[in-house]
Amino acid sequence: MKRAGTLRLLSDLSNFTGAARLRELLAGDPAVLVRCSPDGRHLLLLRPPGSPAPQLLVAVRGPGLPLERAWPEGDPSPLDVFFVPWLARPALILVWESGLAEVWGVGMEPGWKLLQSTELCPDGGARVMAVAATRGRLVWCEERQPGVKDQPEQLSTAFSHRVCFKTLETSGEAGTKLGCTHILLHHCPLFGLIASRKDLFLVPTTNTWSGVAHLLLIWSPSKGKVIVAAPSLGLSHSKSLNPKQGDTWDFRTLLRGLPGFLSPREPLAVHTWAPSSQGLLLLDLKGKVSLVQCHGGTRTVGILQEAPVSLKGSAALGTFHGTLACVLGSTLELLDMSSGRLLEKKVLSTDRVHLLEPPAPGMKNEEELETRGALRLLSALGLFCVCWETPQGLELPSDKDLVFEEACGYYQRRSLRGTQLTPEELRHNSMFRAPQALASILQGHLPPSTLLTTLRAELRDYRSIEQLKAQLVAGDDEEAGWTELAEHEVARLLRTQLTGDQLAQFNTIFQALPTAAWGATLQALQLQPDRSGRLRSQAPPDVWKKVLRAPTAGKEHPNGILPPFELLCQCLGQLEPQWLPPFVKLAQQQGGPGWGAEGPSLPLYRRALAVLGEEGKRPEALELELLLGSGRPKAVLQAVRQLIKKEEWERALEAGLALDASSPLLRSEIFKLLLAEFAQHRRLDAHLPLLCRLCPPEVAPHELLLLLRTHLPDDEGTTPFPEPGAEPPLTVGLVRALLEQTGAQGRPSGPVQSTYEDILWDPGTPPPTPPRGPTASLPASDHPGQEAWVPPGQGLGAADVGVHL
């Protein structure tokens, strides 16, 4: 079972004085203005100009005399009529377009009498366009004609209005009178005035200049401030203002300090405005109802099933017990203000229905206690209230219970378990955090003070940006101002997802102000160089995830828009290219799995190389650094080949030595490349110690010799010495150092595995000396091929002869 919205009859109007006249006016004229007194005992009806008498009727419930006023044909009727709020005795204020204001009240004697008559515009040349009464003040918007003495300059038609107010003061037996005049706003466009119990809303009308018709102002007298709000932009700004101390605002000066509010926007297409306890309700021509809150924020309340046909159609809005009520013609729709869900829709028997504000808090009335706060409807059939009725015996669950019940059904539909989930299990199981978080939010775990503390930094940044925009509009220190603005904007964009319009804006800032944009990025990523020349970052992973996100596979960004990482590499390559390789290397360390686009994505070093230009046109030194720092085998081998081609032997050797033990295959490939160069020429001999260090320890001597033999030049001569001017050949002495490196771990035990290992492990002891006595010469024919033995020290040693391997 659910609660049902009901219409309860409070009165058939027979207990009001002049009931017949009251029913006649309510049934006859749909454009009649209806107001209710704060105590709920008086009903006021004002008919539009040109209507038959009486044009004004005040009916009283219970004892009392009604008030009827009529004005002769040709005389203007009042522009508006108000009950004076927050006073014990009922009082009325009538305001004419000419500026005439009359105060009527009920004194000790029965009946209504005129208490005061005054001119709101005593200097003449002005007319009242809108008027409202709020919290002991009468506020009006008057149109000032050009040429008035107190105006310093000729005003344009668009800004020829000003907003003024008079205080309502009690005066003994006289009851109420209007006090002194104060000016709230100079040189403003035409505004409509709508008063709630605490604030005054200055809203645009159909005649407001289109350039500012998307703005509205909120004046909070108790707080002494004016709030400028732009609902379509989602912006609001507060300014301190205390008219009692002589404070006033020039509307044009006010807008100059808020350049962000002047973005071209369509005027607010509002059909109906209505005050509420939470702010100002507005209904647009599409049927959407929004709430402008007292702090300037705007949120959508709901969308009606039936939208207004035109501006001429009647509509009324009101709220009660967290419910929005809208009367559109003869249809009443009730919506939940928290969710926007349609609760109920009723068809009324008449289309001439007026919504009345609830009685003021603390006012005594004769209605039942359960109707307090309910919405009241007035028609010729009577006075009704709209309220919710809960069936007896039904206990409504709390919001927290409803969350766990709904979550229980949600998880049960998606669960693979056979057991049944219960709300109690969700309450105490820490695995299901979403319903617990939502329940804590509904429970109000964050008071306004805590929320304000959380948002204070964001609000401070927003305020500083608005001040900076005003400084730029004024033309003060433009270069520094634009730099600071770019830094703020880059910092803001890095907190977004950096897609779509945000990414395009990010590119635009880097193109216009690259130095300032990179400085802001430096702060956002918290980049700092260490003593070894490397970059370090303390930025959270979420920031790096946004920066390193790769473009979607198969989709190129239009108009040259680069992804964040490519844009940063391009900017860094132009400003400080020496820091590009360390930045890319740091980015490789920060990158996590799944941070690229869907599908395979390019390595970061290749993405950085792509923005430096086409292959062959890139800065060679920068390309080498990126290839060597990538850690990718193909990239490192490509860099080593380029170094060998440039004959930068030491750098090529250091690139191989820089590899740790986790890359033995890559290190071995680099050694083979350099060993091939070592076998072909002698330009690498000066770096033989580094080549020996690079030699893998697992390479056997015979493998080393086979590698050398593979790369030996084929055009060597047969003579032991090189010809004059020719490059010396590879010698055993040079090879010996490499052979020793292959056995650095100690001579293996067991049988000799290689023909050359006995040479490598020869301890250096010479063979026994032959006897010194004369020996008989053996005929050469007995020992063919055997040469005479040469004593040690007489002849050439093996190391001194150029032996061709």
UniProtKB/Swiss-Prot annotation:
Residues 743-805 are annotated as: Disordered. It is found in: Microsome membrane; Cytoplasm, Cytosol; Early endosome membrane; Lysosome membrane. GO terms for cellular component: BLOC-2 complex; cytosol; early endosome; early endosome membrane; endoplasmic reticulum; lysosomal membrane; nucleoplasm. Residues 764-773 have a biased composition (Pro residues). Its main location: membrane. GO terms for biological process: blood coagulation; intracellular transport; lipid homeostasis; lipid metabolic process; lysosome localization; melanosome assembly; pigmentation; platelet dense granule organization. Keywords: Cytoplasm, Disease variant, Endoplasmic reticulum, Endosome, Lysosome, Membrane, Microsome. Pfam families: HPS6, HPS6_C. One of its GO terms (molecular function) is small GTPase binding. Widely expressed, with lowest expression in skeletal muscle. It is linked to Defects in Hps6 are the cause of Hermansky-Pudlak-like syndrome, a syndrome characterized by hypopigmented eyes and coat, melanosomes greatly reduced in number and morphologically bizarre, kidney proximal tubules secreting lysosomal enzymes into urine at greatly reduced rates, platelet dense granules deficient in critical components, such as serotonin and adenine nucleotides, leading to functionally abnormal platelets and prolonged bleeding times, and mast cell granules undergoing unregulated 'kiss-and-run' fusion at the plasma membrane. Component of the biogenesis of lysosome-related organelles complex-2 (or BLOC2) composed of HPS3, HPS5 and HPS6. Interacts with HPS5 and HPS3. Interacts with biogenesis of lysosome-related organelles complex-1 (BLOC1). Interacts with dynein intermediate chain. Interacts with AP-3 complex. Interacts with DCTN1. May regulate the synthesis and function of lysosomes and of highly specialized organelles, such as melanosomes and platelet dense granules. Acts as a cargo adapter for the dynein-dynactin motor complex to mediate the transport of lysosomes from the cell periphery to the perinuclear region. Facilitates retrograde lysosomal trafficking by linking the motor complex to lysosomes, and perinuclear positioning of lysosomes is crucial for the delivery of endocytic cargos to lysosomes, for lysosome maturation and functioning. PANTHER family: BLOC-2 COMPLEX MEMBER HPS6 (PTHR14696:SF2), HERMANSKY-PUDLAK SYNDROME 6 PROTEIN (PTHR14696). This is BLOC-2 complex member HPS6. The lineage of its organism: Eukaryota, Metazoa, Chordata, Craniata, Vertebrata. The gene is Hps6.
